[in-house]
């Protein structure tokens, strides 16, 4: 059809369609009308049908093409869930079909070939599964139902058993048990000379990577890790960019696991690093080690499908809770069911499920929710406990910080007993531990909890009533159900009143843009507003306790004879109890281990309110609850020191509370030449940020000059949305006139899409917030300049800062200052990601010059090459810097 505009060059390159080809083509309306005549209301098969359908139906007459659209992309995920990719081009090549050329006829030919493969693959799924899928939730319109019904008719009478399917796929899934390192008097380890040989030319690492060149810093780190394992002590290692820290710890840790038949653990913050370990470094290491190396990734409970819930959903025994598109939930059931019938292990993350319209908790469980012995799939057939079992049989387990700290809170019931850990990206673990150990009372989560409880006609209480209705001798239990329904209804209303009070208290909060975060400190607790709030809070606590007692009484009574009936209700009862306990903790506020706060979303008239209790001293908790259980912990990161000192980090993780002889620290410089490749510019004459208009005007000039001088590829990192959006409105039009693209991290924008756009468009620049301060990698010409307008100190009204200031005289210098220094180091680290990268860091906060603490920021950076320049000269400086470095290439 005629596009009514010129075809972009990249589209012509992709499809070979030129402007000449479409010069006489019909209009969109004419083309869609012709398509409707051709289809004649028949079902339409399309790969990613949602895109095609929305595109066609946006044209006048498009809705007349067909009422039934079958998405072969979603169907391929059901038929072949284990494929590495479900792109049409990938499958066409894999199965020898016609190739995809992004031209209509060729792509249709390819889809026809793939379609036949999909139908055959569906018939290869376990007997009876097609009938199970065709019959589930018949009231929900679902385009795949006729296909499954037809295929089920080819094998009538077959009965599907998920339990049998899991037993069949698990036949070969056997492994040897590992020893708990607590049972070993000492670890058998390679000598220092053997470790050095692994990193020498022709050694183990060289065999993994033929172009590998030995690095003194990497060898020093590997030896330090080896010594820590031998002595059963801890290490804090700051390894600059380019040291190769992952290979430095992998080799000695792998040797420890293999030589002692134990499991060792690696915890990362980012998925990128975990994927690098799982799909690149560990497989290569396993290939080169005699006898191989077993490894697995272990994620949180909510990453794995719960087979009990899946079975009940497929049988129609539970309601579909989503209101958005119930058909997507049925598709999710089909995809997951096919996957678990073919895979001994695995998680939900790669299955392509549309979680925006599918309620994830309908398919997952949690540690406290898991039915365990009441579940027919526990433990061997379960994917959650199967993953834990495989982890206990592996040499190396890769997990994340979140799960590690959840395991600490659960007293070791989630992870296998691992006594030797690498905590990579360790600079962020204090924050993550605080988040995982927080006690939260949330309006949204409370609403979902009461929706799950339901009442006389919906939810778990209604389900129990229906299950008991046909049972003999159920009069007592039905009476308990009625009482529970009544107390739950009262509790739901009472807790709603609590959050109405929270929203009123939120009006007292100063600062914040969209979200108010208010410290529940002495001033608030002594106010009339708080005393007014206490009445509704105590009413809510009392109602929650009454509901908890009545639901628990029902669970206990029914569980005596029919425990399977109240599995879900038992979990909800525990959550109801937890809600009451957390609310009491926060309202009482006397436990000095916590700081208390409340949160309100100002953009919403209702909803989004919460109250939180966070652990203040994470180091104390780690020193008493985790480190005593661990023989060796290696804390590694590129950003740990403040002015060359580890004091702040050691306090944050509790190493300063367990004795000086149990740990030591090591700083390793980067193998990259930061002094030659990185420049730091301090804008010396920017007005004080407290004079906001003067500050923004001066900053606007710096931003415009910097972007024009660099020709794009600039990342500006803001500490607050208000400044960012104000400056974007001022700067973006000037960039557009200069032919430069400037994007901004708007409220609903996707960080991933912004990142991809920045990386793929060389002249693109970005204004961004917290998500981009760390973990954002864009090497080479993609990123040549990072600008930090304001030092990232925590807000004066931040509840944790307020609580620390109340308790300690020098809290700001002890906590807020070093935390800000480390954040700036992280941001600076975005610039140099390889030995050939170069870039400029611009610091536009006048406090670097006017305050004594400014030197701490500058002396903590990886280069000593910094200079103060008047803001009017920054553009000229960048032009000279750019010309000099381009000549060097």
State where each predicted segment sits.
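Conserved non-catalytic scaffold segment of RNase H-like nuclease domains
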Residues: 1-68, 81-102
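A substrate-engagement module of RecA-like helicase motors
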Residues: 4, 181-182, 195-203, 261-263, ...
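Acidic two-metal-ion nuclease catalytic site recognized across multiple nuclease folds
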Residues: 116-192
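Conserved pre-motif I regulatory segment
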Residues: 189-237
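Walker A/P-loop
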Residues: 230-252
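Signature of the SF2 helicase/ATPase Hel1-core->accessory helical subdomain module
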Residues: 275, 283, 367-396, 400-539, ...
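A contiguous, basic/glycine-rich beta-loop/short-helix subdomain that forms a polymer-engagement track
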Residues: 361-397, 405, 410-412, 541-684, ...
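Conserved RecA-like P-loop NTPase helicase motor core
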Residues: 671, 683-694, 746-849
């Amino acid at each position: 059809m005629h596009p009514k505009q010129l075809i972009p060059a990249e589209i012509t390159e992709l499809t070979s369609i030129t402007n000449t080809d479409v010069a006489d083509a019909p209009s969109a309306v004419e083309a869609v009308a012709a398509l409707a005549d051709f289809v004649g209301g028949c079902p339409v098969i399309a790969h990613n049908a949602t895109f095609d359908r929305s595109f066609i139906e946006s044209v006048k007459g498009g809705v007349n093409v067909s009422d039934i659209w079958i998405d072969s992309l979603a169907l391929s995920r059901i038929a072949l869930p284990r494929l590495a990719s479900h792109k049409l081009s990938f499958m066409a090549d894999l199965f020898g079909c016609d190739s995809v050329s992004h031209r209509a006829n060729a792509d249709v030919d390819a889809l026809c070939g793939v379609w036949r493969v999909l139908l055959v693959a569906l018939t290869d799924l376990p007997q009876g599964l097609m009938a199970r899928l065709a019959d589930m939730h018949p009231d929900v319109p679902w385009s795949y139902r006729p296909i499954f019904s037809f295929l089920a008719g080819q094998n009538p009478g077959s009965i599907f058993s998920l339990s049998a399917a899991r037993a069949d796929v698990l036949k070969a899934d056997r492994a040897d048990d590992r020893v708990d390192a607590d049972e070993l008097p000492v670890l058998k380890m390679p000598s220092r000379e053997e470790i050095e040989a692994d990193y020498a030319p022709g050694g183990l690492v060289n065999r993994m990577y033929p172009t590998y060149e030995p690095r003194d810093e990497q060898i020093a780190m590997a030896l330090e890790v080896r010594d820590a394992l031998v002595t059963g002590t801890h290490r804090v290692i700051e390894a600059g960019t380019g040291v190769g820290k992952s290979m430095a710890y992998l080799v000695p840790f792998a040797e420890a696991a293999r030589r002692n038949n134990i499991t060792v653990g690696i915890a990362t913050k980012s998925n990128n690093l975990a994927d690098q370990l799982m799909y690149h470094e560990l497989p290569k290491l396993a290939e080169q080690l005699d006898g191989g190396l077993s490894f697995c990734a272990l994620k949180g409970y909510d990453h794995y499908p719960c087979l009990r819930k899946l079975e009940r959903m497929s049988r129609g025994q539970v309601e579909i809770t989503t209101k958005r598109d119930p058909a997507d939930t049925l598709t999710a059931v089909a995809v997951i069911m096919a996957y678990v019938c073919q895979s001994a292990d695995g998680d939900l993350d790669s299955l392509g499920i549309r979680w925006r319209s599918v309620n994830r908790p309908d398919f997952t469980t949690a540690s406290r929710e898991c039915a365990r012995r009441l579940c027919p799939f526990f433990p061997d057939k379960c994917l959650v406990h199967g993953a834990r079992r495989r982890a206990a049989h592996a040499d190396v387990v890769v997990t994340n910080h979140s799960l590690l700290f959840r395991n600490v809170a659960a007293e070791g019931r989630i992870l296998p007993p691992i006594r030797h850990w690498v905590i990579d990206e360790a600079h962020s673990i204090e924050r993550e531990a605080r988040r995982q150990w927080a006690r939260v009372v949330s309006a949204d989560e409370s609403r979902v909890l009461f929706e799950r409880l339901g009442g006389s006609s919906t939810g778990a209480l209604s389900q129990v009533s229906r299950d008991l209705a046909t049972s003999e001798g159920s009069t007592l239990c039905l009476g308990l159900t009625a009482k529970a329904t009544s107390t739950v209804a009262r509790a739901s209303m009472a807790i709603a009143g609590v959050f109405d009070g929270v929203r009123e208290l939120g009006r007292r909060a100063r600062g914040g843009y969209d979200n108010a975060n208010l410290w529940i400190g002495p001033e608030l607790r002594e106010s009339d507003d708080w005393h007014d709030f206490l009445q509704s809070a105590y009413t809510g606590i009392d109602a929650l306790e009454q509901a908890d007692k009545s639901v628990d009484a029902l669970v206990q009574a029914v569980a005596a004879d029919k425990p399977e009936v109240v599995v879900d209700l038992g979990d909800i009862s525990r959550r109801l109890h937890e809600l009451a306990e957390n609310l009491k903790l926060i309202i009482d506020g006397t436990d000095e281990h916590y700081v208390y706060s409340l949160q309100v979303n100002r953009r919403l008239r209702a909803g989004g309110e919460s109250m939180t209790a966070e652990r203040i001293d994470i180091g104390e908790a780690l020193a008493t609850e985790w480190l005593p259980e661990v023989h060796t912990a290696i804390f590694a990161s590129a950003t740990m020191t403040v002015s060359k000192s580890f004091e702040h980090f050691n306090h944050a993780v509790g190493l300063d509370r367990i004795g000086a002889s149990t740990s030591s620290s090591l700083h390793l410089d980067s193998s990259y030449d930061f002094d030659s490749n990185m420049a730091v510019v301090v804008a010396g004459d920017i007005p004080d940020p407290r004079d906001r208009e003067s500050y923004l005007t001066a900053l606007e000039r710096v931003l415009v000059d910097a972007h024009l001088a660099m020709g794009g590829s600039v990342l500006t990192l803001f500490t607050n949305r208000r400044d960012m959006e104000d400056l974007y409105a001022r700067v973006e039009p000037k960039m557009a006139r200069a032919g430069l693209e400037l994007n901004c991290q708007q409220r609903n924008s996707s960080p991933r899409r912004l990142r991809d756009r920045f990386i793929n468009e060389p002249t693109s620049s970005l204004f961004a917030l917290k998500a981009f301060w760390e973990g954002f990698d864009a090497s080479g010409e993609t990123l040549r300049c990072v600008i930090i307008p304001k030092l990232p100190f925590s807000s004066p009204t931040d509840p944790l800062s307020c609580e620390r200031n109340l308790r300690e005289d020098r809290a700001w210098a002890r906590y807020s200052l070093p935390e800000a220094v480390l954040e700036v180091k992280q941001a600076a680290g975005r610039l140099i990601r390889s030995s050939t990268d170069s870039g400029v860091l611009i610091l536009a906060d006048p406090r670097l010059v006017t305050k004594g603490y400014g030197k701490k920021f500058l002396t903590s950076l990886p280069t000593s090459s910094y200079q103060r320049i008047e803001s009017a000269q920054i553009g000229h400086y960048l032009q000279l810097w750019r010309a000099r470095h381009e000549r060097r290439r």
